[in-house]
Amino acid sequence: MAKDIRVLLYYLYTPIENAEQFAADHLAFCKSIGLKGRILVADEGINGTVSGDYETTQKYMDYVHSLPGMEDLWFKIDEESEQAFKKMFVRYKKEIVHLGLEDNDFDNDINPLETTGAYLSPKEFKEALLDKDTVVLDTRNDYEYDLGHFRGAIRPDIRNFRELPQWVRDNKEKFMDKRVVVYCTGGVRCEKFSGWMVREGYKDVGQLHGGIATYGKDPEVQGELWDGKMYVFDERIAVDVNHVNPTIVGKDWFDGTPCERYVNCGNPFCNRRILTSEENEDKYLRGCSHECRVHPRNRYVSKNELTQAEVIERLAAIGESLDQAATV
């Protein structure tokens, strides 16, 4: 299948004057050329992923590079056969990635233009992965890690990036007096978080420059030492990274078998991202727990228009019922 769609991943920390108006103007331009995607704009900069055909994406890159302060913005480009987004969103936010330091009673937010970890090239990062005296920390959410991660990297038990500072403080014995290198999808989270670690007093902090997305495209390392796939926040869900010896590390939520298919839990008040096969999605009503399976607003049940009798039958098949907890 021809790959005539380009997906652009990018960010830039740079002061943006009147960022709310900038976001409105940016949205208008994106819509005028037929671009699709999701862009966040804040006083501190811009962070986005967009997709379109070659002509459209080229127009967009030229436009962004014409904006004051964004002449050298780095676009990471994937070639795909289908659009990665269905609509176009540009939103003004307080931060382009929500670390939430002020919300969580930390001192002040981090300005990566002033404080950030040392940049590591893909080759240097690979060397760090092989160094037994270096701690490698994945700064992404737990469900991103579970789909794929660097071999030996620490998995933080977090569901949101803003939980990471407190998690590190609670687990500081893993990091103190050690060299720490961090990584994320494209680099935007690491720019800020590595700066926070420097401010916290960690003496030797590095970050994978350009993120996993760049590591997978580097002609020298070719994504080696990455296991699984990389989670992305668009219609693709997962993309390849390791072009040397790819593996599957994702495990089905229900039976532990190898799996790289993500869905959201059927309970809208849970909405947990879970890996599961289509067969197990049907079997377990897309509920990550008994409570979620029997929730009155279970989206899987409503979407498939299951009758109560059909729900009871499926629950019985896995040893559960509507009015009692799971027996298996």
From Swiss-Prot:
Active site annotation, chain numbering: C184 (cysteine persulfide intermediate)
Disulfide bridge positions per record: none
Transmembrane residue ranges: none
Catalysis: reaction(s): uridine(34) in tRNA + AH2 + O2 = 5-hydroxyuridine(34) in tRNA + A + H2O
Keywords assigned by UniProt, alphabetized: Oxidoreductase, tRNA processing
InterPro entries: Rhodanese-like_dom, Rhodanese-like_dom_sf, Rhodanese_C, TrhO, TRHO_N
GO MF, one example: oxidoreductase activity, acting on paired donors, with incorporation or reduction of molecular oxygen
Keyword Oxidoreductase: yes
Superkingdom field: Bacteria
Biological process terms in GO annotation: tRNA modification
Enzyme Commission number(s) from the entry: 1.14.-.-
Domain Rhodanese: 130-224
Family: Belongs to the TrhO family.
Functional description taken from the UniProt entry: Catalyzes oxygen-dependent 5-hydroxyuridine (ho5U) modification at position 34 in tRNAs.
Name used for this protein in its record: tRNA uridine(34) hydroxylase
Organism encoding this protein: Streptococcus pneumoniae (strain Taiwan19F-14)
